Design a protein with these regions (language model features):
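Generic alpha-helical secondary structure signal
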Residues: 8, 21, 40-42
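Short, surface-exposed secondary-structure edge patches
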Residues: 1-3, 26-27
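Short, acidic/polar N-cap/turn motifs at the starts of alpha helices
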Residues: 7-9, 35
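Short, well-ordered loop/turn sites that connect or cap secondary structure elements
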Residues: 3-4, 11
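Short solvent-exposed strand/turn elements
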Residues: 27-57
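Short glycine-/polar-rich loops that comprise or flank the Walker A/P-loop
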Residues: 14-15, 34
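Charge/polar-rich, low-complexity and marginally structured segments
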Residues: 57-168
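Short beta-strand-centered aromatic/proline hotspots
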Residues: 15-25
Length: 168
């Protein structure tokens, strides 16, 4: 998982970033450690100075990953379009845990369960579940729009319409 390089776009469970440097720093014991430095891709004027770093040896634990590939986007929509496995149960706690895995493909069943729960409970759909679902859709829309060079709005609509079709 250390195949990142300067210029790469990476993503965590919230934002898309760009690696702008690899530097050697000292850890708490004074030992040299190579680190990636990255910043949000769409930083506001106020956030332009916001940067983060992660030791190369800890990238696997950081939750950062490369953006989904174009083939991954196809697989995502293919899985999203399939009917929900009726054996799956809605577990709100597991939903949040799975989101932190930051894997679009593993997010599909969670998104489908949330959507199904929204349909079944209608106006009783919990506000927190609604917020989580919208956050997932927004994050996936941002990432897929960036990868496919399509608009956020069109990807957002495509995700929601695919969810609706697979739920009927």
């Amino acid at each position: 998982m250390t195949d990142f390089k300067v210029g790469d776009h990476i993503v965590d469970f919230e934002n898309i970033y760009q690696i702008y440097a690899v530097k050697t720093q000292k850890d708490l014991k004074g030992a040299p450690v190579k680190c990636f430095f990255y910043r949000p891709l769409e930083a506001s004027e106020r956030d332009k100075s916001v940067v983060a770093s992660v030791p190369i040896d800890n990238v696997a634990k950081s939750g950062l990953r490369h953006l989904i590939s174009k083939d991954g986007v196809k697989e995502f929509f293919k899985l999203l379009g399939k009917p929900l496995d009726t054996a799956l149960l809605f577990e709100p706690k597991l939903t949040k845990e799975a989101l932190y895995l930051n894997d679009p493909i593993k997010t599909v069943p969670i998104l489908k369960l949330l959507f199904q729960n929204k349909i079944q409970t209608a106006e009783k759909f919990a506000k927190t579940n609604s917020e989580v679902m919208e956050r997932i859709v927004k994050h996936l829309s941002d990432e897929i729009a960036f990868v496919t060079k399509k608009s956020f709005k069109s990807i957002h609509s495509q995700i929601l319409s695919t969810l609706k079709k697979s739920s009927t």
